[in-house]
């Protein structure tokens, strides 16, 4: 698709860059197979643009998307200068050779591998057999896939030139002259490949796979920890993919416009930060306009009412205009000054009479409002005696309040009437529901009822998910600054809702049955089937523990399963349930965990299934699989979403994005 096309073109240019230096110097270009086999690349489409045509470096290539957006992609250093001198830089190995490392396998037991109908037996340095087993006994003919002939010579010059074993990091042996093949009449032959497996134990040799690429020609892959000390066979460190960084390439005028927009947005952000970090509001000053008493003494009542309304409007925006709070406080104190009609005072006396209140929190603002309301109630009778105009203007505003507060009996009567109407409506609804349930019981089968119950439950879960999404949108971004804190809050909310659903399912069902029995006679229903108990939340998580044990030499493995009554199984199930509830996860699908350790002989009853250390480590294993794996998947999804958004953006276009279908992007 689009991303694959872009990546393939980049890799093609990358290979061209590898070949180009050799052709310019007159040499012969060669394809570096070692690089392709051991290096991985990942493309990163970044949102930060660059000015096109400014970089002349050899590691920069120009590509274009399907929307004609040009990119400058910088190839990683490893793509241009791969480790061509790796062989020379390899430290000298002073340990035993590869044949010496594998020689202890001669005295070890033969390795067995069962695949479909056949069982394969490999005896190091001797032969390879194939036969069929039934009831731990060999049935039918034993076929020889080959006898030991030779081993790969690491010191041979021809072997060094092939580099096949060095690249694949395996040692091989050849087995031939086996049983005659019925298909082509030739003797069977096999190649055995030995690979390092650092995770296996001291004697952890095992046959990993058996392939038959050609008729009667076999390839056995054996993994063993014996070869890991050798540097040529030790697996390379798993390196992260080499990133190919691609920046949108803009024309000079587009790039300058982008830089100007960034500068403007930065200045706007700095101003906003400075506004938030302002110190305490400044105190009143005698130079402020509008606070000098002589000019305000002759103000009309209409102006005072407008000032009072402006004060309550400004209280709704306390943080945006902090200096105006003090002005409104001064204006609220002006009625007292006008009532007494004092002569003009000096600035010093004015400052002594001013009360400065600093509002630092919403609680302080509420207290200030209450004080101002109390002050106006106390001051209004005095002002009413000397200024009848004020009382005349304030009476209409008080009348609605008195009407609301003075009729509690009428309000109670209205509430009682509404309650009676609600009860009548509820009774009608109950009757309709009862008739509907009667009809359903006569029509629906028990399976249909279970299905309807499941659909109702699914609908409840969808509603809860919508509530969670709405809660996430309403979360204060300043209160939960870190994404991890927001995720933990959502998980905790999900866990709480799951517990509520569980309690509702446990408590509501018997209560509903009692209500139905009170209203009408219901025929007795048969007891619920065992399947319904398994659908209960208590049985959503089931742990199954099985043990594989050899029945004897050259015999099949016996499978033992832990009984449900085993207390150790109950302990493991409780551990998993607690982890799922705490992290707000649901149990979906199956998870298989294999614990490989030396087995003990004995029956199921006297054998210890899991050691204390195994049980202790299970919690960490579950956490890594369920929780940490989910977080990594979420991060990867977010990264892919950002890459797709960056790819769709077309710089300089009116809409700013391409017109491609979202489904066609698959990085």
Curated annotation (Swiss-Prot):
Disulfide linkage: 110-123, 181-216, 196-228
Record's comment on post-translational modification: Intramolecular disulfide bonds.
Domain MRH: from-to ranges: 108-230
GO biological process: endoplasmic reticulum unfolded protein response; ERAD pathway; protein retention in ER lumen; response to endoplasmic reticulum stress; retrograde protein transport, ER to cytosol; ubiquitin-dependent protein catabolic process
Gene Ontology MF term list: carbohydrate binding
Gene3D superfamilies given in the database record: Mannose-6-phosphate receptor binding domain
Family to which this protein belongs: Belongs to the OS-9 family.
Protein name (Swiss-Prot/TrEMBL): Protein OS-9
Origin species: Bos taurus
Taxonomic lineage of the native organism: Eukaryota, Metazoa, Chordata, Craniata, Vertebrata
Gene transcribed to yield this protein: OS9
